[in-house]
């Protein structure tokens, strides 16, 4: 046999491998993230775990939360709705031994799903998911470092010849204990992850690696204590979960309860079922600007790999639509940031349910339509509504009891309160404004009692000058007595310097057709 018949195919194969490695090396992390579009989580399948049941077979784990294993048809349909990335969360703990050796039957199942996703030219994010849960093993940190390295060594070697569409994510939601976060352990294991994957060779040398944030929370990850690993390939992205504000996104429903104050005024306290006021929008603007300044501007793209809202807790559907639309439109409008929807899919077992993967049914047609439009670039772009201003005006469109405003270290000159007064000539009414410094010390209290009692029924502006005090942190406005005689309509803050804000009313009006 001519030796060329043996050598030539080998030469061609090696040449193709080097060509592809060169192609991967030519794309930086931002170019890859920009192609990833919107993402979708195959939640509550391979990531499932149980507090009470023993899991002995892959099928038991995959179906534990009522979802079926991903199929070719399922992935094709998810792609059809506009998603270009599939996050594939995997919990490994039931099918690895004490040294981290993976059982073959589990690796086979994992590989089947990845092959389906990659075949559809979708990006696939593979991770180590609930192994970091408090019932898992990864929570033990440095004690199990060798096991963690061994686990990733096997995963990396299994998939080292896969193309750039496969992305590895180091871990998920770990190392937060009560009010203390173990940055040292996270930094150490993230570095071990990068070193292990890069040293496995093949396409892993240039693969995009997604580095777990500090408990994947934006606040903890943007801290000066958080550090990204050293990577000679310079191909990293940082992982963030966006469940903000907690009270709306993750707050469970509870029966409202009432109480009466000393004046006989009835108050009601209940769950936060609505979202979408100016402060909500400004929170998202502030958070995306924080991601931009902390990571994107420093050469690190951000993958927000979990976004969602509890759908089974009686939250207003319009607010759910609005929240998802705004978050995903922000991520689409910011270079270097992309989002993945967390979808548990099954209403019996899941708590964030948007699309029934088993039966190809969206639970809300507006949400389905909005995702598809955003994927095509046909969405209201938030940056078109950004403004620079020295004023911040907040409509108080809910029952008022106490309102807290955080200045984010901006110097406030005036606080202007617009209120409707009724019957105040005959009652003892106190409107209180407290200002705080960065140490939460009260630096000024304004009692509006004397001024208010001189007013007749009507709508008035009460102006409080705070320009000569240390008013850089926050204020609290509340009515201590006579709340039934006053309706607060609006609060305006005048700042010393201009800042980036949103033309809230115009943006709110622009997206109305997408949420109603």
Spans of model-derived segments:
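Aromatic-rich peripheral "rim/lid" segments of glycoside hydrolase catalytic domains that contact
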Residues: 313-391, 501-507, 511-515
């Amino acid at each position: 046999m001519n030796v060329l018949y043996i050598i030539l195919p080998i030469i061609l194969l090696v040449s193709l491998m080097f060509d592809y490695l060169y192609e991967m090396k030519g794309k930086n992390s931002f170019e890859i993230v920009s192609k990833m579009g919107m993402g979708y989580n195959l939640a509550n399948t391979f990531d499932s775990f149980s507090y009470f049941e023993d899991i002995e077979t892959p099928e038991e784990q995959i179906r534990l939360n009522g979802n079926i294993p991903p199929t070719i048809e399922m992935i094709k349909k998810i792609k059809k709705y506009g998603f270009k990335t599939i996050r594939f969360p995997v919990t490994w703990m039931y099918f690895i031994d004490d040294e981290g050796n993976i059982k073959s039957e589990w690796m086979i199942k994992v590989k089947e799903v990845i092959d389906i996703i990659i075949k559809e030219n979708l990006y696939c994010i593979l991770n180590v998911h609930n192994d970091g849960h408090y019932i898992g093993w990864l929570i033990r940190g440095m004690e199990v470092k060798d096991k963690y390295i061994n686990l990733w060594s096997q995963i990396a070697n299994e998939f080292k010849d896969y193309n750039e569409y496969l992305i590895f994510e180091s871990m998920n939601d770990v190392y937060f204990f009560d009010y203390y976060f173990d940055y040292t352990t996270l930094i150490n294991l993230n570095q071990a992850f990068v070193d292990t994957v890069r040293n496995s060779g093949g396409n892993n040398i240039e693969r995009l690696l997604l580095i777990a944030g500090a408990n994947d929370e934006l606040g903890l990850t943007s801290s000066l204590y958080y550090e990204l690993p050293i990577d000679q390939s310079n191909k990293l992205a940082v992982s963030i979960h966006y469940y903000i504000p907690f009270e709306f996104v993750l707050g469970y429903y509870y029966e409202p309860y009432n109480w009466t104050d000393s004046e006989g005024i009835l108050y009601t306290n209940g769950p936060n079922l609505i979202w979408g006021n100016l402060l909500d929008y400004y929170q998202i603007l502030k958070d995306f600007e924080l991601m931009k300044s902390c990571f994107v501007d420093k050469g690190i793209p951000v993958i927000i790999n979990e976004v969602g809202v509890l759908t089974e807790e009686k939250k207003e559907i319009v607010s759910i639509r609005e929240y998802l639309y705004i978050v995903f439109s922000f991520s689409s409008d910011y270079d270097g940031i992309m989002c993945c929807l967390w979808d548990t899919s099954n209403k019996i077992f899941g708590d964030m349910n948007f699309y029934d993967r088993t039966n190809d049914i969206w639970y809300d047609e507006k949400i389905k339509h909005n995702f598809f439009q955003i994927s095509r670039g046909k969405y209201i772009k938030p940056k078109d509504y950004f403004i620079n201003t020295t004023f911040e005006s907040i409509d108080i469109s809910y029952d008022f009891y106490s309102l807290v405003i955080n200045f984010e270290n901006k110097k406030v000159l005036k606080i202007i309160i617009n209120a409707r007064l009724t019957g105040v000539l005959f009652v003892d009414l106190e409107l209180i404004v407290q200002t705080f410094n960065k140490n939460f010390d009260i630096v000024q209290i304004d009692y509006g009692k004397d001024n208010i009692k001189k007013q007749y029924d009507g709508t008035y502006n009460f102006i409080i000058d705070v320009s000569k005090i240390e008013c850089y942190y926050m204020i609290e406005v509340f009515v201590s007595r006579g709340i039934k005689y006053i309706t607060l309509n609006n609060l305006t803050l005048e700042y010393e310097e201009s800042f980036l804000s949103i033309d809230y009313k115009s943006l709110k009006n622009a997206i109305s057709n997408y949420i109603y």
